């Protein structure tokens, strides 16, 4: 059986990896979106760990809501990415610095 400490450590490691992905690679939109999704999954691991430790299902239900919002966020982010690539022919954030209609 996995202890609470191990699950929290896993969540912290995933969160730190996602922070490193955001800070080390700010130019690529795909890496930024993947890092944000990994950050949300790290938070979900912590919710599941505490929910399991306390014997309450509220944390597990909250994770389902977070996953739903994360899926919608990923769909909107990918739609923006496709539009960005079609108009500017790049996915580099540094090259796209102006919002034009």
From Swiss-Prot:
One of its GO terms (cellular component) is NADH dehydrogenase complex. Its EC number is 7.1.1.-. It holds the Pfam family Oxidored_q2. The chain crosses the membrane at residues 4-24, 30-50, 62-82. It is found in: Cell inner membrane. GO terms for molecular function: NADH:ubiquinone reductase (non-electrogenic) activity; quinone binding. NDH-1 shuttles electrons from NADH, via FMN and iron-sulfur (Fe-S) centers, to quinones in the respiratory chain. The immediate electron acceptor for the enzyme in this species is believed to be ubiquinone. Couples the redox reaction to proton translocation (for every two electrons transferred, four hydrogen ions are translocated across the cytoplasmic membrane), and thus conserves the redox energy in a proton gradient. NDH-1 is composed of 14 different subunits. Subunits NuoA, H, J, K, L, M, N constitute the membrane sector of the complex. PANTHER family: NADH DEHYDROGENASE SUBUNIT 4L-RELATED, NADH-UBIQUINONE OXIDOREDUCTASE SUBUNIT ND4L. This is NADH-quinone oxidoreductase subunit K. It comes from Xylella fastidiosa (strain Temecula1 / ATCC 700964).
């Amino acid at each position: 059986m996995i202890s609470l400490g191990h699950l929290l450590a896993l969540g912290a490691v995933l969160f730190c990896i996602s922070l490193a992905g955001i800070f080390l690679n700010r130019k690529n939109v795909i890496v930024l979106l993947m890092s944000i999704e990994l950050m949300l999954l790290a938070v979900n691991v912590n919710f599941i760990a505490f929910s399991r430790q306390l014997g309450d299902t509220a944390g597990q239900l909250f994770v389902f809501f977070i996953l739903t919002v994360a899926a919608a966020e990923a769909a909107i982010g990918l739609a923006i990415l496709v539009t960005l690539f079609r108009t500017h022919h790049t996915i580099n954030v540094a090259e796209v610095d102006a919002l034009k209609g």
